[in-house]
């Protein structure tokens, strides 16, 4: 079986990670002790992707939990599914990273990283044929961002041909913990551009807006935001966990979704949007699901796809529905909005259907878009970064851990390059793409 090793780093990463395990354990009929009480063979068909089968028929998540302080791990351990994890897979320090990327990446995190890699190695060795890794973390703090990206580069060194996938929570002033979030996020993106194959950008700004506008929650809590994240993560991984044809493993998803190696930042979306503990009173139709799914209000990144163009799209429908109707509606959506899809990648929208809906819903749809509009998110962080960096505000916290200002400048320009690359492909047309090539060759020859 093609296995995935899951890592979660830092407070945010551990909270959304453990929520993810609660949701998928429930979907696969696995209780908090790791025993199976399901009702469908489909639940066990590809259970090995995320779970090890231990003695006594218990299923144990193939998960590694990492943090630089014990607090969050203690609450995961005492949480609803805390006992399902392998006790040896909790790796934590005592010092904390104090929301400082440099501590996570260069000092405190670097001291803990080898003991994490030992656990990762052990999990990888227990795999029949490892397809890759997924990391849940945030980009705004110290551990998830600094140590998370350190782990990615170390794992990349050791497993260069395996897929590296991240669920990265992007900071926003609307839900802010720390003033240095733009620094931490920019330094992280600098790493993610080079070292991951696919990154799902989960944007706190968008989550907050969904809770506030759509779900009418006046003061959204992290619990409310995480409910949306777990629904999205469950949807995105559906094809990996249940039998199916399309995007059935991380590599196939990457091949369909990533036309250029650096442009691997996806906007996830979900429909229908429900609040925690909320009830769906009427079942949606396929046309409604499709329409909602492409609506910017349902996107988990605060970008409006109408301000850019889609390079590629993957859609996952869940529940019992007619394949024919799904295909018709998806074609319809593309034809009606053809100007929002680049014409130089034909058939750039792929659709999968899975029979098992998420709990509490008859039907649901998950959206994964690789859109040039994601540049709005990077621009937002870049502006906040520049505002502080030109005054060198708070820099001493980073240089004190041995960092050089040069690294900040490099990270800043790498992110600006990324924005220009997205813009370049947004403006490209089918005809002129060929002309660029020729001009380039001509200049080289001159």
Swiss-Prot record:
Belongs to the tubulin family. Its cofactor is Mg(2+). Residues 426-446 are annotated as: Disordered. SMART domains: Tubulin, Tubulin_C. CDD domains: beta_tubulin (cd02187). One of its GO terms (biological process) is microtubule-based process. One of its GO terms (molecular function) is metal ion binding. Dimer of alpha and beta chains. A typical microtubule is a hollow water-filled tube with an outer diameter of 25 nm and an inner diameter of 15 nM. Alpha-beta heterodimers associate head-to-tail to form protofilaments running lengthwise along the microtubule wall with the beta-tubulin subunit facing the microtubule plus end conferring a structural polarity. Microtubules usually have 13 protofilaments but different protofilament numbers can be found in some organisms and specialized cells. The modification 5-glutamyl polyglutamate is found at residue 438. The MREI motif is common among all beta-tubulin isoforms and may be critical for tubulin autoregulation. GTP binds at residues 11, 69, 138, 142-144, 204, 226. Coiled coil: none annotated. It comes from Notothenia neglecta (Yellowbelly rockcod). Tubulin is the major constituent of microtubules, a cylinder consisting of laterally associated linear protofilaments composed of alpha- and beta-tubulin heterodimers. Microtubules grow by the addition of GTP-tubulin dimers to the microtubule end, where a stabilizing cap forms. Below the cap, tubulin dimers are in GDP-bound state, owing to GTPase activity of alpha-tubulin. This is Tubulin beta-1 chain. Some glutamate residues at the C-terminus are polyglycylated, resulting in polyglycine chains on the gamma-carboxyl group. Glycylation is mainly limited to tubulin incorporated into axonemes (cilia and flagella) whereas glutamylation is prevalent in neuronal cells, centrioles, axonemes, and the mitotic spindle. Both modifications can coexist on the same protein on adjacent residues, and lowering polyglycylation levels increases polyglutamylation, and reciprocally. The precise function of polyglycylation is still unclear. Mg(2+) binds at residue 69. A motif (MREI motif) lies at residues 1-4. It is found in: Cytoplasm, Cytoskeleton.
């Amino acid at each position: 079986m093609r296995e995935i090793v899951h890592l979660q780093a830092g407070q945010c990463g551990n909270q959304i990670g453990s929520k993810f395990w609660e949701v998928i354990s429930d979907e696969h009929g696995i209780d908090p002790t790791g025993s199976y009480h399901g009702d469908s063979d489909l639940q066990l068909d590809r259970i090995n992707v995320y779970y090890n089968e231990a003695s006594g028929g218990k299923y144990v998540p193939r998960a590694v939990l990492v943090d630089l302080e014990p607090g969050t791990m203690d609450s995961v351990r005492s949480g609803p599914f805390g006992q399902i994890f392998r006790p040896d897979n909790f790796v934590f320090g005592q010092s904390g990273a104090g929301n400082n990327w440099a501590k996570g990446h260069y000092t405190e995190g670097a001291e803990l990283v080898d003991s994490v890699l030992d656990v990762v190695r052990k999990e990888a060795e227990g795999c029949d044929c490892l397809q890759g890794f997924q990391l849940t973390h945030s980009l705004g703090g110290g551990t998830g961002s600094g140590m998370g990206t350190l782990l990615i580069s170390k794992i990349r060194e050791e497993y260069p041909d395996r897929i590296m996938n991240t669920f990265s929570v992007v900071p926003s002033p609307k839900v802010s913990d720390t003033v240095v979030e733009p620094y931490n996020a920019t330094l992280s993106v600098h790493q993610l551009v080079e070292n991951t194959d696919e990154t799902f950008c989960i944007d706190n700004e968008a989550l907050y807006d969904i809770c506030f506008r759509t779900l009418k929650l006046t003061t959204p809590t992290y619990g409310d935001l995480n409910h949306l994240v777990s629904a999205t993560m469950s949807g995105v991984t559906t094809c990996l966990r249940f039998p199916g044809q399309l995007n059935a493993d991380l590599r196939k998803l990457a091949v369909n979704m990533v036309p250029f190696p650096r442009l691997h930042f996806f906007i996830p979306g979900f429909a229908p949007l429900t609040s925690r503990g909320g009830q769906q009173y009427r079942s949606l139709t396929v046309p409604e699901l499709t329409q909602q799914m492409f609506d910017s209000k349902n996107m988990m990144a605060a970008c409006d796809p109408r301000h850019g163009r889609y390079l590629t799209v993957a859609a996952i429908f869940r529940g019992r529905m007619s394949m024919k109707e799904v295909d018709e509606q998806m074609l319809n959506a593309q034809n009606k909005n053809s100007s929002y899809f680049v014409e130089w990648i034909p058939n750039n929208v792929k659709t999968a259907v899975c029979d098992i809906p998420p709990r509490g819903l008859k039907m649901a749809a998950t959206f994964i878009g690789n859109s040039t509009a994601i540049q709005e998110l990077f621009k937002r962080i870049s502006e906040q970064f520049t505002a502080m960096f030109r005054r060198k505000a708070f820099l001493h916290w980073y240089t004190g851990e041995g960092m050089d200002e040069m690294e900040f400048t490099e990270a800043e320009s790498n992110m600006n390059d990324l924005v220009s690359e997205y813009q370049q492909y947004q403006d490209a047309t089918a005809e002129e793409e060929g002309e660029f090539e020729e001009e380039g060759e001509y200049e080289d020859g001159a």
